[in-house]
Curated annotation (Swiss-Prot):
Its main location: plastid. It holds the Pfam family Ycf9. PSII is composed of 1 copy each of membrane proteins PsbA, PsbB, PsbC, PsbD, PsbE, PsbF, PsbH, PsbI, PsbJ, PsbK, PsbL, PsbM, PsbT, PsbX, PsbY, PsbZ, Psb30/Ycf12, at least 3 peripheral proteins of the oxygen-evolving complex and a large number of cofactors. It forms dimeric complexes. One of its GO terms (cellular component) is chloroplast thylakoid membrane. The chain crosses the membrane at residues 8-28, 41-61. This is Photosystem II reaction center protein Z. May control the interaction of photosystem II (PSII) cores with the light-harvesting antenna, regulates electron flow through the 2 photosystem reaction centers. PSII is a light-driven water plastoquinone oxidoreductase, using light energy to abstract electrons from H(2)O, generating a proton gradient subsequently used for ATP formation. Belongs to the PsbZ family. The gene is psbZ. One of its GO terms (biological process) is photosynthesis. Gene3D superfamilies: Photosystem II PsbZ, reaction centre. The keyword Membrane applies. It is a multi-pass membrane protein.
Length: 62
């Protein structure tokens, strides 16, 4: 179970870095928010889900 948590934490870190780079680039385009609103919201919801899943799994490991 510990290895699964470690893999999930690494995936969360990588996903966070991708969002840190991708969201500002997407929003800086001419039609940024209106064109990419659903993608940004979906990616953000996925990130929140990963954070919650990591927290739940951490409660079982610790």
């Amino acid at each position: 179970m510990s290895i699964i948590l470690q893999i999930l934490v690494v995936a969360l870190i990588v996903y966070s870095f991708v969002l840190i780079v991708a969201v500002p680039i997407t929003l800086s385009t001419a039609s940024g928010w209106s064109k990419s609103k659903s993608s940004i919201v979906t990616a953000s919801i996925g990130w929140v889900g990963m954070v919650l899943l990591t927290g739940v799994l951490n409660s079982f490991v610790s």
